[in-house]
Design a protein with these regions (language model features):
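Intrinsically disordered, low-complexity boundary segments flanking structured domains
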Residues: 12, 27-30, 66-75, 81, ...
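Sec-dependent signal peptide recognition
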Residues: 2-10
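Nucleic-acid 5′ end/cap handling module spanning
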Residues: 22-61, 118, 145-263, 267-275
Length: 276
């Protein structure tokens, strides 16, 4: 599942100007460690921009047309493929700056289309991916790449794989049931696994809410020990939005790595630090 911040960011991309029908895609649920996924497959969860090729054009998750160069999509298949437009780990801002342009430039040569699904094909996940693999055999220079799927033979493999990905600067892991036919919506057979970090900050300002949070707290503006300002708008219960902790309170929040500017990514409130 994409985070709220990322979704809003994508909706505001000025270059994705041409609307199409919103594609019916599959979405990830969150992995529960109590669930056995032995017999499933796992892959790295790439932090890029989702790109859905419907057989004729490249679209965002929300149905906006992505203005990719003609040379980039000239050898795309006549059938649908789904994946992430990606360059390298920890480069979401860089990817966005390339993809959002109305007039695409040469920086698109840094982009690959990392595919995790071939919709509407017969069989399980690996069978569907094999359809694309056969198509790419004579197209070795294609920007289309298939994300490698690793079999899960023992439960501990998921944790070790996640730790290895995070050490390399990756976002997380996706585990999927390879025997399931293609489906859309939020699936119990496709799960995201993330490893988060946490730290403390002091509340500097209480920001008012909008929409359903009108009259309540919308977010907290906090400062970390390193002097970094962080806006935290998720993770709160309704009662906490009605009665937010006062300015000067120290809270703990979780986040998923750092941006290039050193800001915590996707901060989520965890708890108020108890005075001991």
């Amino acid at each position: 599942m994409k985070t709220i911040i990322k979704i809003l960011y994508l909706l505001c991309l000025p270059s994705l100007l041409l609307a199409a029908d919103k594609p019916d895609l599959f979405l990830l649920k969150t992995y529960d460690e109590t669930k056995s996924v032995v017999g499933w497959v796992m892959s790295e969860k790439l932090d890029g921009i989702r790109g859905f090729w419907d057989g004729k054009q490249l679209l965002t998750r929300g149905g906006k047309r992505i203005m990719a160069p003609d040379w980039f999509i000239e050898n795309y298949p006549p059938f649908a493929i789904d994946g992430e437009l990606w360059t390298k780990r920890a480069d979401f801002e860089g990817i966005s700056s390339i993809v959002r342009r109305k007039n695409p430039d040469e920086r698109w040569r840094k982009i690959t289309h990392q595919i995790f699904e071939v919709p509407n094909q017969q069989g399980g996940l690996l069978d569907r991916l094999a359809v694309l693999r056969d198509y790419l055999k004579m197209r070795v220079d294609s920007p289309i790449k298939i994300i490698k799927q690793y079999p899960i033979n023992q439960r501990h493999q998921v944790k070790r794989f996640l730790q290895n990905i995070v050490r390399k600067g990756g976002e997380g892991v996706v585990v999927r049931n390879p025997n399931t036919a293609y489906q859309t919506g939020r699936l119990s057979s496709a799960l995201k696994v993330k490893q988060y970090l946490d730290t403390e900050c002091v509340i500097e300002e209480i920001l008012p809410g909008k929409g359903k949070y009108t009259g309540k707290m919308g977010a907290l503006l906090c400062k970390t020990k390193k002097g970094v300002l962080v806006k935290i708008g998720s993770g709160f219960k309704d009662i906490q939005r009605e009665n937010p902790p006062p300015i000067g309170t120290t809270i703990t929040f979780k986040y998923f790595g750092l941006t290039k500017k050193g800001k915590p990514k996707y901060p989520v409130f965890l708890r108020i630090r108890l005075v001991r």
